[in-house]
Every structure is written in C-alpha cells, then in structure tokens.
Amino acid sequence: MKKLKVVTIVGTRPEIIRLSRTIAKLDKYCDHTLVHTGQNYDYELNQIFFDDLDIRSPDVFLECAGKSAADTMAQVIAKSDDMFAEVAPDALLILGDTNSALSAVSAKRRKIPIFHMEAGNRCFDMRVPEEINRKIVDHISDINMPYTDIAREYLLNEGLKPEFIIKTGSPMDEVLSYYSDKIKASDVVSRLDLKQREYFVVSVHREENVDSDSNIHKYVKVLNMLSEKYQLPIIVSTHPRTRKKIDALNFQFSPL
C-alpha cells in the first residue's frame, strides 16, 4: 500500500520542539519529507534542539534567511514553491504562525491540502507580525487543528466551517511525556545552584517587547522587583535578540 506523501515545514525552535514527536510518527507511517526554512538556522537557535531531542536532520534546507522580514517571507514562499514542485506531496503539515508557515501560500496555489496545527490563536493586535501570518494561514488551510475550544470559537467566528476544524489539544503533552525521564535526569538545577521550586524562569524575546527600549526597561524593572519581593532568583532564558539588547543597554539585574 502506497504511503501518504507528507511534507512538514519548520523554521524556529518552538516548531521543532512541539513537532518532535509528530515528526517521529510521520516518519513511521508516511512518506515524510522534513523541510527547514533556514530562516534563523544556527546552533543556539535550532541545531541544539535537534541534538537534545534526538530529531533526525531535515531532508531539505530552503536557506530563507533574508536581509529583512519581507525578504525572508518572499523567500519562504518562492523556495517552498520550488520544493513542492519537486517533491509533489499529498499534504503539507505546518504548525503555528511564524514566517515558515507562509509556505502554505505556495502550497495553496499548487492545490496541496494544508493541515495547520495550532490554528485559531489570536491576540487581536495587527501590529504583531504573527497575528498577520496566523490569519492568512488559518483562512487558506484545508484542515485547521486548534488546541482549545476558545481557538476553535475564534475560527468559527471568522466564518470557517466547523467540519474543517478539528480540536486536537497541544502536542506538548506527548513531548513532555516522552522526554520526562530525560527532563528529570537533567542536572541544570544543581549546576545553577538552585533549589527545586525556589526560582522564577522568564523568557522575553518578542519583537514588540525587546526592540522597544521603553518596554524592555519596564520588564527589567518588574523582574528586579519580583526578585526582591520574594527573595528568589530569576533565571532569564535569553534569546540572541534579548541578549544583544541587554548588553547594548547595560542592564543591571538584582544580585539574587
């Protein structure tokens, strides 16, 4: 029996993590091609997650790192179109709302069925680049797969037909379950000289938060206040964008 030919496209850390177990299942049951857009491919942002999660290397790298966001988006659409012409998949699977999801535009033009995981998320702020992407992708996908009832309602309110919306829940349940032993065996807490449940973990990397001097100053002020109030250390997981801004503005953090 001929296997369904599926292309999965990723481009960022969250997509790699959330799809890690889905990729394994597609490899097992489908004729599966894993594609990386290359929009920010480096060790810190991507390869470390392929290594840590034991995910196989992508079959195709599109190398879509453009000089601007518009350039990257244009390359994702154009280069994915070339890839679709060569691979001729029966279906495209994408997750989320980053620029890699815009490969759905070229898939739609080629009449390739599109399955969109994490559909229906909304922040109702069109200044956010991902809000634009998710609305485009939701409305051209053949099957939308929201995680929650709320996300499903947003899709219905925008006129999408209920028979093409399937609430799936988050794939992170399977991811956390599969890697639970590895997570428990990690020595990161002891290496950082922390006590279980006696610290905060924070990640700040969104463009609208980090690129604004005013906004990031407010975040640092709040983090320092929290640390002082609760007398607990705060671990800031720094995206390269955030690290660059912190260094440029020479922020001072609470010694805790």
Where are each of the predicted segments found?
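Residues at the starts of beta-strands that form the adenosine-phosphate
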Residues: K5, D31-T33, P113, F164, ...
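Donor-nucleotide binding loops and adjacent catalytic segments primarily
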Residues: Q39, Q47, K184-L256
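Active-site and donor-binding regions of nucleotide-sugar-utilizing enzymes
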Residues: V7-V10, I16-T22, F49, F61-G159
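Conserved nucleotide-sugar phosphate-binding/catalytic loop shared by glycosyltransferases and other
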Residues: D31-T72
